[in-house]
């Protein structure tokens, strides 16, 4: 089994998030025993901001048995296709990253509907990479992933 890890799971542990750190550590420990843990280059880049050097980040990855696996053309093309669909269909609604529920926000002054891109292409690259190069993805961003990558198995905590 190959398990991909999203940045938020690793940041929970690195930044010691009191709400999610234990669940995230348990997820990583559980799936590490089932097979290979991997991250894509975007997760690597996002994690690098938390380390004094690339050498320190690489040591962390070795110590946690996490392997950097680069995206292939299939993953990158899929991320672009899903991003295009997301951009076209998102209209004026926001989406909760946890439950996937959509809602609108209006300006308190002029009552105009506020539009905002909640997800950038990197979120799509991480998910497409996981879909094409692993069995499942560890992430707390399940609402977004369910809406845009229904074909991807996502675990945010042990059930």
What annotation goes with each model-predicted range?
Residues 1-39, 46-66:
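Short, well-structured N-terminal submotif of metal-dependent ribonuclease cores
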Residues 2, 109, 113-116, 127-159:
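Acidic, PIN/NYN-like endoribonuclease modules and their adjacent C-terminal/linker elements
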Residues 7, 41, 120-124:
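Conserved glycosyltransferase catalytic-site signature
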Residues 10, 44-47, 76, 144-145:
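A generic structural signal for short hydrophobic patches within well-formed alpha-helices
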Residues 44, 54-57, 76-77, 123:
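A general structural signal for well-ordered alpha-helical segments in protein cores
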Residues 46, 96-107, 119-136:
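Acidic, metal-associated active-site segment
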Residues 54-58, 87, 154-158:
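Short, hinge-like loop/turn segments at secondary-structure boundaries
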Residues 66-115:
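Acidic catalytic patch
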């Amino acid at each position: 089994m190959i398990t991909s890890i999203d940045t938020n799971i690793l940041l929970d542990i690195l930044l010691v998030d009191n709400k999610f750190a234990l669940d995230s550590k348990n997820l990583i420990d559980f799936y590490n025993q089932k097979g290979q843990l991997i991250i894509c280059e975007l997760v690597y880049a996002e994690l690098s901001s938390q380390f004094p050097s690339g050498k320190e980040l690489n040591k962390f990855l070795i110590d946690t048995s996490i392997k950097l696996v680069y995206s292939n053309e299939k993953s990158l093309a899929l991320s672009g296709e899903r991003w295009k669909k997301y951009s076209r269909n998102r209209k004026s609604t926001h989406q909760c990253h946890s439950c996937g529920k959509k809602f609108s926000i209006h300006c308190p002054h002029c009552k105009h509907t506020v539009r905002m891109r909640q997800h950038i292409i990197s979120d799509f690259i991480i998910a497409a990479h996981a879909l094409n190069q692993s069995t499942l993805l560890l992430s707390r961003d399940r609402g977004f992933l369910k809406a845009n990558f229904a074909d991807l198995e996502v675990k945010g905590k042990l059930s």
